[in-house]
């Protein structure tokens, strides 16, 4: 947790970051960091709340106890209010600081007799800032230039002066409230609420700011502010130089070295842990900028009126003493004295009649713009000079240093970056009623000086900044020449004008001790930083007003002298407890103050001596502080490192445990995932196998159904074809029968007519031959012929009608048959298309089956190769195992033989040993018997026997020992043999297990080979089935092609028959035409015959004429040949010839008609459709 706290402190954009990280720490960490950082409670949002004071007091008991030893009660109570604006971070152990302050208190008691005579005034002043200070906090990055100004020294400021002003502004309190907010935005606000902000601004300027960068309260030389955060002075802090007691170039080198750039984020932790230097932090600009402070116009006017007489008294100064141009400061100094400091007050417009002088004085308050720390900003942007808001401007560190360090400065710099909190509270608490109106009246003068100064400062900003750099060396030289009483008088004179909020009391503390005030004195006066007013009060007036025996009298005289023309007269003693808790009597004893009245030379000497004495004591204090700070820093680092080590150890253990748990979780998850994958893949394989079986079954059933459907369709088609053929054959047979019957009837009629015609011909011949005698018979013949022709016509019409009716009936029947045949043909076409589609599908299926068969065959080959390889591997492994087994058997047999031999040898040895033992026992028994017998004989012999027995005993013991050794060796060897036997048994068991594993592997391989064989058989079966299906498809295709060829052959036959019928019809038609021509010729002959026979009666000519008219047209083509023939041939022969021709033509026509009818029957559409089908 300590490492976390340190990281958060490093990332903190402001010191208050440590407060947020502190809230989550435990008790032990709080104790450790309480030692490191002091009380780390956050500064309250509203400083007036007493809870924050109680918390601060409770969190730092040692701090409070150490203060109580040497701080007055009133001062301690007054400091409680100022704690609200105190720093949240300190650079040193507060105990060390307080111990150092005790020594300073004793020294100040010796120097200044009446040091604590007016300490009760600090009570009201200390309580002011927390109660009436504005409560609006600025964020971490929004501090104005006024707050940044005191942390930015110029490039080469005087060593002592820069340190005096800078060391106490090490910390920029970004978390504190803006004391100017709410005071400057509203011009109509009451002056009682405006004065606290103006008086609280200069507080950080005094050395009290070293204890905390917030506004502090006026303190006596022994007072030390009670802060929320303890001070931790770094080893690099030059305390003596900061307090104004050191003029060594070392401080300047430190400060200029620290100005090289902004500090990194690491410096935050350095500040919190006391490892940084105050000078480094002073070179860093604040993270925010305060706005320019401008007073109301009524206050500016009042301040301007006061400064008119003061300006007249400043004309005696030399022009070389003016830092920025020809401007003369508003506060008077002794004649002939040169001031090295800028007589800069942001409210200098109150002391001069012309606005130009006011702007110059206003511009002199911002030399920090020339500091190289912030080259990014323009000349005085960081000071807020170009802002139009009403906040105060920030004084540069050089100006603060000059105000607190130079004894010759007649005009004091207004530290406007932080409010002088104590003064606004002094008026209500300890100021008399007569002193309050002047304090309120000081505000118009401040407003007036700033109303005219911002514009002029913007116009002459560049010249002013360049002039600041040029005046630095002259300021360093002039600083040594200015030590003397005029500074004291000027400071004392300016103290009466401090209610306007422009004169820091730190300068009074510097000027009173001959240019450099002691550290306690400057700390006590840190919070009492009233602004410089515009009244030009002379040094003589200052000496008559302030150096009085009684602080009350001095305050009264000061207020009385300046009340008439100074509306912002400040009462510096107990009457103004918040504004001047450290009066002039705190700096000098009353006797010394009285001795200062006659002349300024004696005051110079006295103040110089006091400054030297305090500078020497301050150096010793600084060394002590540095050593103690370093010690506390080292202890803090050791505690921090121990905490970090413990925390890292705990973190490492937790990380190891977490890592182990993560590893276990990962392994468990991996195992579970592997199991899930195995089960999922097994399920998927099973599912695919089932799907394959289902698909194969579906395919087989689909093939069977397709075959059945095809067989049904083929059978149905064949049945339909057979039925159509039968119907066609029946129809053709019926038509043939009808035609034959009609032909028979027509033949009969024709024969009958031929017979009649023959009879008529015979009769006509007889009549012609006997024309003369048979005229009547001829007429009868003619009538018969006419009757015959009429009957023939009726017969022909009847035949034609019958032909029409039969043809219509036949056409209807034929149309129906054609429709049926067309439907059958369409069905046949659909069936053919279906057969084509089925054939294509079968071809596709056959192709797929071939591809699958090839793939399966390829896989089968691969599987066969793999199985063969596995078989070879298994066989080789089996052979090697067999060889190993043989070798092991041989080894085991050899070892068994060796074991048997060893056993036999051991048994033999045991037997020999037992035999030897038995022999020895027997020998011993014999010896004992001999011994007893010999013992009885004589003593000598007994002795010899005894010796012999002893010798035998020793031998026996030796033999027994050797036997025991041999037996032990045998037992060891037996144990070894037993161990070897157990090892052999274990190896045999391992071999058995390996054999079982091999057997299992062999079984598995056998099962795999069986599965592969079964799969190969299935594949072969599938290939056979596919080939069978392919052959069946091919057969079906061939049958379909054969049927198509048969249908095409039938169509060709029908087409040939149609062609033949068409030819027959043409012939019949030609025959009919020839018969018609013959009839016409016969009619013509009939007409010509009566013309050649004059004896014919006229009634015979009527029918003859009609017949002639009927046949006249066809016979007109050959009239010439008929006439000569009639003329040459006898008429009866010609008549017979004509009759024969006529009958021949009729017969020919009849035959042609019959032939045409047959051809039309053959050319009927149903016959064509049937044959084409």
Swiss-Prot record:
Q: Where is the composition biased (Low complexity)?
A: 80-93, 206-216, 1110-1124
A single GO BP annotation from the record? cilium assembly
Q: How does it assemble?
A: Interacts with PARD3. May interact with FAS cytoplasmic domain. Interacts with TRAPPC14.
Species whose genome carries this gene: Mus musculus
Q: Supply the alphabetized keyword list.
A: Cell junction, Cilium biogenesis/degradation, Coiled coil, Cytoplasm, Cytoskeleton, Isopeptide bond, Phosphoprotein, Ubl conjugation
> Which stretches does UniProt call biased (Polar residues)?
331-345, 396-411, 468-477, 533-544
Tell me where the cross-link Glycyl lysine isopeptide (Lys-Gly) (interchain with G-Cter in SUMO2) is found: 1002
Annotated region described as Disordered, given as residue ranges:
17-168, 180-225, 241-566, 1091-1124
What this protein is called in its record is Fas-binding factor 1
**Localization terms from the record:** Cytoplasm, Cytoskeleton, Microtubule organizing center, Centrosome, Centriole; Cytoplasm, Cytoskeleton, Spindle pole; Cell junction
| Keyword Cytoplasm among record annotations | yes
Give an example GO cellular component term for this record.
spindle pole
Biased composition (Basic and acidic residues) is annotated at 46-56, 247-258, 287-299
Q: Which residues carry this modification: Phosphoserine?
A: 172
Q: Looking at the record's lineage, which domain of life comes first?
A: Eukaryota
Function noted in UniProt = Keratin-binding protein required for epithelial cell polarization. Involved in apical junction complex (AJC) assembly via its interaction with PARD3. Required for ciliogenesis.
Q: Which residues form a coiled coil?
A: 617-742, 808-917, 975-1057
Q: In which tissues is it expressed?
A: Broadly expressed.
């Amino acid at each position: 947790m300590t490492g976390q706290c340190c990281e958060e402190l490093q990332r903190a954009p402001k010191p208050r970051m440590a407060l947020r990280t502190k809230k989550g720490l435990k008790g032990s960490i709080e104790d450790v960091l309480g030692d490191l950082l002091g009380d780390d409670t956050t500064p309250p949002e509203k400083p007036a709340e007493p809870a924050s004071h109680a918390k601060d007091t409770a969190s730092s008991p040692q701090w409070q106890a150490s203060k109580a030893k040497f701080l007055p009660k009133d001062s301690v109570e007054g400091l409680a209010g100022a704690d609200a604006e105190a720093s949240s971070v300190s650079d040193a152990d507060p105990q060390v600081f307080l111990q150092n302050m005790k020594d300073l208190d004793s020294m100040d008691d010796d120097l200044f007799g009446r040091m604590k005579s007016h300490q009760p005034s600090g009570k009201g002043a200390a309580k002011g800032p927390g109660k009436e200070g504005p409560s609006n906090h600025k964020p971490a990055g929004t501090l104005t230039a006024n707050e940044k100004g005191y942390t930015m020294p110029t490039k080469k400021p005087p060593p002592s002066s820069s340190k005096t002003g800078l060391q106490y502004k090490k910390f920029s309190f970004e978390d504190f409230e803006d004391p100017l907010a709410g005071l400057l935005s509203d011009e109509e606000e009451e002056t009682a609420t405006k004065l606290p902000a103006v008086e609280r601004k200069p507080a950080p300027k005094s050395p009290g700011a070293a204890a905390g960068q917030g506004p502090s309260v006026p303190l006596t030389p022994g007072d030390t502010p009670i802060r929320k955060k303890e001070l931790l002075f770094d080893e690099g802090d030059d305390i003596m130089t900061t307090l104004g007691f050191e003029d060594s170039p070392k401080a300047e080198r430190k400060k200029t070295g620290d100005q090289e750039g902004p500090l990194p984020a690491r410096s935050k932790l350095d500040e919190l842990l006391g490892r940084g230097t105050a000078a480094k932090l002073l070179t860093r600009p604040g993270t925010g900028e305060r706005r320019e402070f401008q007073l109301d116009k009524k206050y500016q006017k009042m301040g301007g009126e006061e400064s008119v007489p003061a300006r007249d008294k400043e004309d005696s100064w030399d022009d070389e003493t003016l830092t920025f141009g020809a401007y003369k400061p508003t506060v008077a100094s002794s004649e002939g004295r040169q001031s090295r400091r800028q007589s800069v007050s942001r409210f200098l417009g109150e002391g001069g009649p012309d606005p130009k002088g006011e702007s110059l004085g206003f511009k002199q308050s911002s030399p920090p713009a020339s500091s190289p720390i912030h080259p990014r900003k323009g000349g005085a942007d960081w000071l807020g000079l170009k802002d139009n808001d009403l906040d105060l401007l920030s004084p540069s560190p050089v100006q603060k240093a000059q105000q607190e360090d130079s004894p010759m400065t007649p005009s004091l710099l207004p530290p406007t970056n932080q409010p002088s909190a104590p003064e606004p509270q002094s008026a209500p608490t300890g100021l008399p009623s007569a002193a309050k109106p002047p304090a309120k009246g000081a505000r118009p003068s401040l407003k007036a000086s700033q109303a005219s100064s911002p514009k002029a400062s913007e116009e002459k900003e560049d010249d002013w900044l360049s002039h600041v750099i040029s005046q630095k060396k002259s300021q360093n030289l002039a600083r040594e020449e200015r030590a003397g009483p005029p500074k004291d008088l000027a400071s004392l004179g300016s103290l009466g004008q401090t209610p306007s909020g422009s004169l820091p009391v730190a300068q009074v503390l510097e000027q009173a001790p001959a240019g450099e005030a002691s550290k306690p004195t400057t700390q006590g006066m840190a919070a009492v930083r009233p602004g410089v007013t515009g009244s030009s009060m002379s040094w003589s007036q200052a000496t008559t007003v302030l150096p009085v025996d009684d602080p009350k009298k001095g305050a009264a005289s000061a207020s009385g002298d300046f009340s008439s023309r100074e509306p912002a007269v400040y009462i510096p003693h107990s009457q103004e407890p918040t504004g001047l808790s450290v009066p002039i009597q705190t700096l000098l004893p009353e006797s010394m103050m009285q001795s200062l009245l006659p002349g300024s030379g004696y005051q110079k000497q006295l103040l110089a001596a006091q400054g030297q004495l305090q500078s020497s004591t301050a150096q010793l204090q600084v060394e002590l502080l540095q050593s103690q700070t370093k010690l506390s820093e080292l202890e803090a680092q050791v505690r921090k490192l121990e905490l970090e080590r413990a925390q890292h150890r705990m973190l490492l253990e937790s990380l190891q445990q977490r890592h182990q748990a993560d590893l276990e979780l990962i392994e468990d998850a991996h195992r579970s995932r592997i199991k899930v994958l195995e089960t999922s893949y097994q399920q998927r394989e099973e599912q695919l196998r089932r799907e394959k079986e289902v698909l194969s079954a579906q395919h087989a059933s689909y093939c069977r159904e397709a075959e059945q459907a095809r067989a049904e369709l083929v059978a149905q088609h064949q049945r339909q074809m057979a039925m159509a053929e039968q119907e066609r054959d029946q129809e053709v047979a019926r038509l043939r029968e009808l035609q034959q019957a009609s032909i028979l009837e027509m033949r009969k009629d024709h024969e009958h007519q031929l017979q009649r015609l023959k009879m008529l011909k015979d009769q006509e011949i007889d009549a012609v031959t006997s024309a003369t005698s048979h005229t009547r018979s001829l007429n009868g013949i003619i009538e018969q012929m006419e009757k015959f022709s009429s009957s023939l016509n009726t017969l022909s019409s009847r035949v034609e009608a019958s032909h029409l009716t039969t043809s219509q009936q036949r056409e209807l029947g034929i149309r129906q048959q054609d429709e049926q045949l067309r439907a059958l043909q369409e069905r046949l076409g659909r069936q053919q298309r279906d057969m084509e589609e089925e054939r294509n599908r079968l071809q596709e299926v056959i192709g797929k089956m071939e591809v699958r068969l090839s793939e399966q065959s390829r896989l089968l080959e691969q599987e066969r190769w793999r199985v063969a390889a596995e078989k070879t591997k298994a066989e080789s492994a089996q052979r090697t195992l067999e060889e190993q087994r043989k070798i092991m058997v041989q080894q085991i047999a050899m070892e068994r033989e060796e074991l048997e031999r060893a056993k036999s040898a051991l048994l033999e040895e045991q037997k020999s040993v037992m035999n030897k033992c038995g022999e020895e026992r027997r020998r011993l028994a014999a010896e004992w018997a001999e011994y007893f017998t010999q013992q009885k004989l004589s003593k000598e012999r007994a002795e010899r026997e005894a010796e012999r027995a002893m010798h035998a005993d020793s031998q026996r013991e030796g033999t027994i020992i050797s036997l025991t050794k041999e037996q032990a060796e045998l037992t060891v060897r037996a144990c070894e043999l037993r161990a070897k036997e157990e090892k052999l048994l274990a190896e045999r068991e391992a071999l058995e297990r390996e054999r079982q594993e091999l057997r299992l592997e062999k079984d598995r391989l056998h099962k795999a080979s069986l599965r592969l064989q079964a799969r190969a058989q299935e594949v072969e079966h599938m290939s056979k089935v596919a080939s069978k299906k392919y052959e069946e498809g091919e057969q079906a295709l061939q049958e379909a092609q054969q049927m198509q060829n048969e249908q095409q052959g039938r169509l060709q036959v029908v087409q040939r028959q149609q062609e033949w019928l068409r030819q027959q019809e043409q012939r019949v038609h030609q025959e009919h035409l020839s018969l018609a021509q013959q009839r016409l010729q016969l009619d013509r002959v009939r007409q010509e015959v009566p013309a050649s026979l004059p004896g014919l009666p006229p009634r015979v000519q009527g029918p003859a004429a009609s017949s002639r008219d009927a046949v006249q047209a066809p016979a007109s083509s050959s009239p010439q040949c008929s006439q000569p023939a009639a003329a040459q041939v006898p008429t009866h022969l010609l008549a017979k010839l004509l009759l024969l021709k006529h009958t021949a033509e009729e017969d020919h026509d009849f035959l042609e008609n019959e032939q045409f009818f047959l051809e039309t029957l053959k050319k009927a559409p149903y016959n064509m459709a049937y044959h084409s089908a």
